[in-house]
Amino acid sequence: YRRSSDLIGTLTFVDEKGRYGALGHGISDVDTGELLHISKGALYQAEILGIQKGKSGSPGELSGLIRYEPGQIIGAVDTNSKNGIYGSFYDRRAGIPVKKTEVAYKQELEVGPASILCCVDGSVKEYDAEITRIDMNHEDTNKSFVIHVTDPELLEITGGIVQGMSGSPILQKGKFAGAVTHVFV
């Protein structure tokens, strides 16, 4: 039993009804690895304060500050699943850019150029990446394709994908293709 859990992750999408998805993977108990049951929770906007660059053998991470004040809540968490956290997004004034984007069918994905949206310096930017492998039949839906960062700017800042980027939207040919879920070490 856990009273609370806090972590830095990324808002993945907000639908037209104001429902959001974030993180790209579930929140698990640090001791048992079991998916936590969440009865209620709040989504807060975080401020990224530092970046530990990822390198071989070390995943790197975004570190930030979460202000646990009522005025900082931008949504409610009502679901924790293996594919992420979900709930109601109710503060569009948070300055988070939400842009209508078509969703790609998994059959449309292909090895080749893609991009990820993430915030490493105070604003959301699109960075070049590449889908290098696709497995349509992988038993874990969180591992249906592999993406590598190719953008020189993001590689310089983070070394690639780091902890805290989980949930970052992945785009291919202008369509929403998925979310960052894991970091390769």
Give the positions of each predicted feature:
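Charged, low-complexity helical/coil segments in non-catalytic cytosolic or luminal regions
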Residues: T12, G18-S144, V183-F184
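Extracellular trypsin-like serine protease catalytic domains
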Residues: K143-P152
